[in-house]
């Protein structure tokens, strides 16, 4: 029982000591510099057993109902096959097997194909169970079904690529041979998911190895998202390291897979240093990319695989660490959730590596993380814990999603001791449901609290409404919404998402008449095209004071001033007896909602550290004396004067997605947004093929020399 587990941790310790110095070249970026190994081990203690103790769910196993008793039971039958009731012995036909159920059998009568992507989730607790109890014959049998071996879609492949190096030898030579045969022929012309979704046909079948001339081996149309491609390509490289030289991976010889894989990941890293990545700071999908890279780091068994996987891991974690406050992400995200920072994979990873609060203790640990020898360096630790001079500003030039257009969007971030505020100037509606346009995170004694909002197209703190534009300078942000117009030339663009999503007019919607569940759910359903701007304020954030058309929030860590564009605003809260098990309105379980009405609606938020004032009264007096907001509804212009006497001027652009902005009278240009090229800040600069770090006098740079990262 202990054999696989003991060998795993021995293997990890050997690799940690053997390779870290060779890979990093500089102590500042070495995994050995990670400053909290004891704390990390304490935090992950018992997590493998916890993962193993979770119920084993065979989501691919269909159900049937006894025609005599009406009692349901599980089967392994295909639709139309004869089955027998275990209660009465009656023979009858298996009905539909569900999305994940078995669909085909091979010539030996074994299930050769399942629907869906069940092993995205099911394989992880099974792996944990087998690491602790190798002789579980039921689980070993389940993982020997040919249809399960064939599940090499990206999420499942990423899980198999951790299972195989850890447990393949324990499964035996015959199992390994069958697994290698499944991998050798894997190709899919459909796109199974972990939910009941169907997609259009693919232009090119998916496989593990990919298309050699495309970014990470996937074409822009339907070759997979950034995290999909990282999971597939990393899995192929791991398989290539552990399969015989004569084996095939999706039809490709092992030797060619190794060469192609190195090319994919080296090219991706070089692009990161020139443009940044397209799926930036994704709270949803970064964990899956990270897990694929951890597989490479731990198991690809070549110096080049460890070098490139570590370099990319370091980049992803460093560039997200400075935006993290107590494990919650502030600022913009690409492919982020509509309800940010509610706990999940990324927060769990932060908790284990950095000791930040666990926002959802019931969420399972990442098997990949807790069985990996990779550790973030002290530099990344310092970025995460803000162990450098504060406050700080960061400008980021974001590329298009496929990294083929630099500076496609412009992000700004302001970080202080207890809060982070960030936003992005967007030029395209691209997967707007998963675009976080702006957010504010505040550290509190009760954990991090996240604010967000916009015109209620998505009715959530996140999402990109085509009617919303922002402007930010340091600790001040203006959020505005109005009707838009689509210029004539844009109407000729095929598939123009702005034309499709922003052509409907905005309409007045009266406030809900009660705080009851039915009324609020109905109101939320009608609010998508409301002529208003919403602000989601976490419950328990602090005491709220409403003074002279300003809303002040008193918190022990920070003070906020919210200035609505007009006096026509109101609060929406759920009643004490309301319960929202599903739907958009469930957000009111954790938030109260400020609604600002108007054809040109919005608000300005200014936030300061509470210890920068002797008392809240002093802050209030300073707001009354210095803070000013001027709004011209006709011209859609806003000018805000801050406590620091900086002026932030926004001019809403009805025919665009990005406002015109002036700061202290100077026009803000977007063409050369980030002087370094990608990231520009004191602790972190990226661009023109170089990553530069500077924390407390420890200065280093990384660039690619002789086809590998060079640390200076």
Residues covered by each model-derived region:
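Bacterial N-terminal signal peptides
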Residues: 9-19
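Sec/Tat signal peptide C-region and signal peptidase I cleavage site
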Residues: 21-25
């Amino acid at each position: 029982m202990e054999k696989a587990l003991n060998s795993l941790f021995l293997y990890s310790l050997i690799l940690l000591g053997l390779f870290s110095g060779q890979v990093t070249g500089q102590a500042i970026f070495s995994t050995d510099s990670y400053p909290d190994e004891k704390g990390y081990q304490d935090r992950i203690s018992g997590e493998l057993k916890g993962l193993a103790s979770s119920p084993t769910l065979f989501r691919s196993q269909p159900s049937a109902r006894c025609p005599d008793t009406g009692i349901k039971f599980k089967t392994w039958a295909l639709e139309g096959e004869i089955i027998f009731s275990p209660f009465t012995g009656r023979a009858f036909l298996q009905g539909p097997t569900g999305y994940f159920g078995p669909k085909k059998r091979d010539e030996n009568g074994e299930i050769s194909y399942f629907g869906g992507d069940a092993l995205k989730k099911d394989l992880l607790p099974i792996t944990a169970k087998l690491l602790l109890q190798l002789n579980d014959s039921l689980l070993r049998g389940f993982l020997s079904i040919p249809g399960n071996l064939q599940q090499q879609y990206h999420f499942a492949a990423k899980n198999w690529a951790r299972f195989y190096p850890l447990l393949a030898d324990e499964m035996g030579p015959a199992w390994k041979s069958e697994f290698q045969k499944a991998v050798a022929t894997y190709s899919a012309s459909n796109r199974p998911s972990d939910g009941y979704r169907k997609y259009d046909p693919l232009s090119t079948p998916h496989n593990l190895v990919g298309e050699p001339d495309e970014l990470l081996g996937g074409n822009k149309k339907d070759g997979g998202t950034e995290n999909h491609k990282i999971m597939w390509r990393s899995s192929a490289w791991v398989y290539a390291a552990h399969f015989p030289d004569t084996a095939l991976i999706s039809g490709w010889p092992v030797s060619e897979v190794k060469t192609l894989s190195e090319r994919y990941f080296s090219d991706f890293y070089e692009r990161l240093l020139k443009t940044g990545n397209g799926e930036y700071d994704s709270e949803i999908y970064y964990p899956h990319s990270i897990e694929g890279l951890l597989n490479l780091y731990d198991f690809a068994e070549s110096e080049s695989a460890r070098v490139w996987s570590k370099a990319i891991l370091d980049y992803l974690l460093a560039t997200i660490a400075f935006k993290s406050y107590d494990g919650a992400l502030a600022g913009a995200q690409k492919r982020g959730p509509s309800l940010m920072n509610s706990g999940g994979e990324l927060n769990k990873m932060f908790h284990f590596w950095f000791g930040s609060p666990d926002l959802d203790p019931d969420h399972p640990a990442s098997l990949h993380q807790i069985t990996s020898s990779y550790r973030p360096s002290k530099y990344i630790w310092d970025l995460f814990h803000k162990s450098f001079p504060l406050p700080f500003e960061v400008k980021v030039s974001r590329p298009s999603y496929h990294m083929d257009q630099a500076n496609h969007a412009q992000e700004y971030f302001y970080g202080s001791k207890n809060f982070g505020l960030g936003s992005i100037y967007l030029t395209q509606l691209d997967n707007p449901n998963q675009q976080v346009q702006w957010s504010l995170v505040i550290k509190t004694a009760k954990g991090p609290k996240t604010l967000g909002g916009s015109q209620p197209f998505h009715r959530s703190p996140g999402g990109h409404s085509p009617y919303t534009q922002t402007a930010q300078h340091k600790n001040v942000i203006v959020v505005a919404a109005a009707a838009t117009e689509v210029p004539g030339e844009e109407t000729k663009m095929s598939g123009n998402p702005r034309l499709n999503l922003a052509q409907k007019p905005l309409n007045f919607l009266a406030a809900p008449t009660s705080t009851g569940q039915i009324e609020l759910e109905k109101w939320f359903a009608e609010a998508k095209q409301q002529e208003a701007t919403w602000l989601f304020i976490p419950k328990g954030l602090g005491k709220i004071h409403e003074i002279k058309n300003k809303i002040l929030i008193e918190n022990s860590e920070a003070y906020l001033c919210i200035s609505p564009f007009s006096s026509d605003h109101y609060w929406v809260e759920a009643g004490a007896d309301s319960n929202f098990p599903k739907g958009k309105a469930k957000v009111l379980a954790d938030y109260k909602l400020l609604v600002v009405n108007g054809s040109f609606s919005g608000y300005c938020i200014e936030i300061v550290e509470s210890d920068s004032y002797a008392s809240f009264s002093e802050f209030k007096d300073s707001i009354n004396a210095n803070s000013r907001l001027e709004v011209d509804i006709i011209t859609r212009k806003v000018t805000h004067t801050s406590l620091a006497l900086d002026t932030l001027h926004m001019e809403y652009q009805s025919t665009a997605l990005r406002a015109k902005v002036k700061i202290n009278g100077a026009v803000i240009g977007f063409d050369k947004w980030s002087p370094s090229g990608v990231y520009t800040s004191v602790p972190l600069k990226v661009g023109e093929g170089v990553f530069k770090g500077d924390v407390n006098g420890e200065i280093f740079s990384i660039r690619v020399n002789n086809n590998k990262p060079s640390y200076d």
